């Protein structure tokens, strides 16, 4: 009874209270047994409790609906405020662009007026100058043709306009009241009651995209877009925009479309199949089957449903649709790689072996020869050391300790052909000697000229680049013999090489012995079986006496190691002095320029270790595994 009293104080619906009162009335039937009376008594005691519980549930659902509506009102209020701000900001942006356009138009009109007035002023100034000349000539008459000039100038003056062709009036005209009215009446905030909202949602027409897809209309619930008339701005024809006509009425702002928040509206409505309705109507299983066929080429799913079975009715429960939504959500959460088919490609072992070299990492230093020490610098000049990079230098101890490595034969030519050091005081030819070669004012650098003379002097040439012994050789030279026809086609340097080989054969005894051995017939080297010991003894005695045998046997000569080693490729001084070809002056200058104009070569040799074998400097292809 306490529960009933507590519930009675709440605002319960009238229908439940009246039904409870009717149920509390005494029964009018008299033919009931005691058992029936006992059951009625229990039923009458339980009926008010169930009704109170139902009333409580209704109140709780109503409170939750009110709270949800309140929350939705807050969200809609924020949305409306954001829309108002966006609309106003867009129109402010339009006003700003309109302002910029008007300013540009004002500048353009001002520029056109100024150009027109400047042209008129130029014509007037030119005519004024003509009249000034005529007035000066009339005051001091020197010619008789002044009458014609005066008539021409007066005619031009009559054709010109003496007033400004363009007016200085320039003002801005704006319909301020219309702008104020448009701004004041722009936009409105409206709301709908619950009944009107349901009516709008029921009578709404779907969007054009959905209307063009009958499959969506027949099988899925689509929230329809509200069919709203366009505002006055968008309903205005294009001619009114061009003519800038004022609209007759202020445009009305219609309420935006608010989608339904009820989950029942988004689900498929249940309906009982009529007997005359065709059972071949597409159902939900068939719908998902069509979508699955579209995604078969993208998805290889392990959980494939049996899409071929079709149900005869179109009744589906809400639980089944929720399962479908859960499955679609699981598909959305899947990784993109699970949706795409990655074909299994078997790699060819030959291709792997070919492209393996491109995939491996390599370093450039692995292909270059490592420098062990820097003792082979040009002229034994120690290069400058950077304080920041002292720890990175490999030969720091060699340079600081002053160790002198034993120079090999390959380094001797570097020391011998080191560049001489010239002083500006000794070489400069100018009246006022320069302090450095960089400040030299001569046409050609004094340092280059001194270097050229030093090179010519080392080669045994005079200041003009001609050999000093050449004239003596030309005077003492005998007439040459007629060369064979083959040597006429040879290059002069080849002729010199051929003559030098003949001279070496004549001078070197070992080469002469070898040539004699080659020219001897093979019969002298063959052993004869019919020779007796007496004849052999005679030949030995003859061989001791004859000097020709000594020439034919180089083994009887004293051992000379130089005869068994190939001669050096360096050119002797004798061959240099006996060169017959005369070198031109421009060629000598070119050699001097190449020698002096490439200091990077010296830097290159300063970093190279010339004591190493030449084959190590050649490029070697990497080993193929």
Swiss-Prot record:
GO terms for cellular component: autolysosome; autophagosome; chromosome; cytoplasmic vesicle; nucleus. Keywords: Chromosome, Cytoplasmic vesicle, Lysosome, Nucleus, Receptor. Pfam families: ARA70. GO terms for molecular function: transcription coactivator activity. The keyword S-adenosyl-L-methionine does not apply. It is found in: Nucleus; Chromosome; Cytoplasmic vesicle, Autophagosome; Autolysosome. GO terms for biological process: intracellular iron ion homeostasis; response to hormone. Its main location: nucleus. InterPro entries: NCoA-4, NCOA4_N. Interacts with MCM7. PANTHER family: NUCLEAR RECEPTOR COACTIVATOR 4. Cargo receptor for the autophagic turnover of ferritin. Acts as an adapter for delivery of ferritin to lysosomes and autophagic degradation of ferritin, a process named ferritinophagy. Plays a role in erythropoiesis, possibly by regulating hemin-induced erythroid differentiation. Binds chromatin before initiation of DNA replication and detaches during replication. Inhibits activation of DNA replication origins, possibly by obstructing DNA unwinding via interaction with the MCM2-7 complex. This is Nuclear receptor coactivator 4-B. It comes from Xenopus laevis (African clawed frog). The gene is ncoa4.S.
């Amino acid at each position: 009874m306490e529960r009933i009293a507590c519930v009675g104080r709440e605002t319960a619906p009238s229908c439940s209270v009246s039904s409870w009162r009717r149920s509390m009335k005494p029964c009018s039937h008299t033919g009931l047994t005691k058992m029936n009376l006992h059951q009625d008594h229990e039923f009458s005691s339980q009926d008010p409790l169930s009704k109170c519980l139902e009333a409580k549930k209704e109140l709780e659902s109503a409170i939750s609906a009110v709270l949800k509506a309140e929350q939705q009102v807050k969200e809609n209020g924020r949305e409306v405020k954001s829309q108002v701000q966006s609309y106003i900001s867009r129109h402010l942006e339009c006003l700003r662009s309109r302002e910029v356009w008007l300013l540009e138009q004002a500048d353009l009109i001002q520029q056109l007026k100024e150009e027109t007035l400047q042209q008129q002023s130029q014509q007037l100034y030119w005519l004024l100058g003509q009249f000034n000349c005529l007035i000066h000539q009339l005051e001091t008459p020197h010619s008789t043709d002044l009458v014609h000039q005066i008539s021409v100038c007066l005619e031009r003056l009559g054709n010109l306009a003496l007033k400004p062709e363009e007016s200085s009036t320039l003002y801005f005209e704006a319909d301020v009241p219309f702008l104020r009215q448009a701004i004041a009446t722009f936009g409105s905030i409206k709301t709908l009651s619950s009944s009107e909202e349901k009516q709008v949602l029921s009578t709404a027409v779907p969007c054009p995209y959905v209307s063009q897809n009958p499959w969506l209309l027949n099988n899925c619930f689509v929230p329809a877009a509200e069919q709203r008339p366009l505002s006055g701005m968008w309903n205005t024809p294009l001619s009114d925009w061009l003519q800038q006509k004022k609209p007759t009425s202020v445009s009305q702002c219609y309420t935006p479309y608010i989608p339904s928040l009820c989950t029942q509206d988004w689900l498929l409505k249940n309906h009982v199949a009529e007997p005359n309705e065709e059972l071949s109507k597409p159902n939900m299983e068939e719908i998902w089957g069509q979508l699955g066929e579209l995604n078969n080429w993208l998805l290889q799913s392990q959980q494939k449903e049996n899409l071929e079975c079709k149900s005869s009715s179109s009744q589906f429960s809400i639980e089944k649709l929720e399962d479908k939504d859960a499955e679609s959500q699981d598909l959305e959460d899947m990784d993109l790689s699970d949706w795409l088919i990655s074909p299994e490609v078997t790699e060819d072992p030959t291709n792997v072996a070919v492209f393996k070299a491109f995939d491996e990492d390599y370093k450039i230093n692995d292909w270059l020869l490592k420098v062990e020490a820097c003792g082979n610098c040009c002229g034994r000049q120690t290069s400058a050391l950077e304080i920041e990079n002292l720890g990175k230098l490999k030969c720091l101890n060699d340079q600081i300790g002053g160790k002198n490595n034993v120079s090999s034969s390959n380094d001797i030519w570097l020391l011998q052909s080191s560049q001489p050091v010239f002083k500006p005081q000794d070489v400069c030819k100018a009246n006022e000697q320069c302090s450095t070669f960089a400040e030299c004012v001569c046409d050609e650098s004094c340092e280059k000229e001194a270097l050229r003379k030093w090179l010519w002097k080392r080669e045994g040439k005079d200041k003009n680049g001609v050999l000093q012994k050449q004239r003596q050789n030309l005077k003492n030279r005998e007439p040459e013999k007629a060369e064979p026809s083959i040597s006429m086609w040879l290059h002069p340097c080849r002729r010199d090489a051929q003559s030098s080989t003949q001279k070496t054969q004549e001078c070197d005894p070992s080469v002469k012995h070898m040539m004699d051995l080659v020219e001897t017939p093979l019969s002298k080297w063959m052993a004869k079986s019919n020779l007796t010991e007496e004849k052999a003894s005679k030949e030995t005695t003859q061989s001791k006496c004859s000097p020709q045998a000594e020439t034919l046997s180089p083994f009887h000569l004293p051992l000379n190691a130089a005869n068994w080693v190939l001669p050096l490729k360096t050119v002797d001084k004798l061959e240099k002095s006996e060169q017959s070809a005369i070198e031109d002056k421009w060629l000598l200058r070119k050699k001097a320029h190449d020698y002096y104009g490439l200091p990077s070569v010296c830097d290159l040799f300063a970093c190279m270790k010339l004591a190493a074998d030449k084959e190590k400097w050649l490029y070697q292809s990497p080993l193929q595994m």
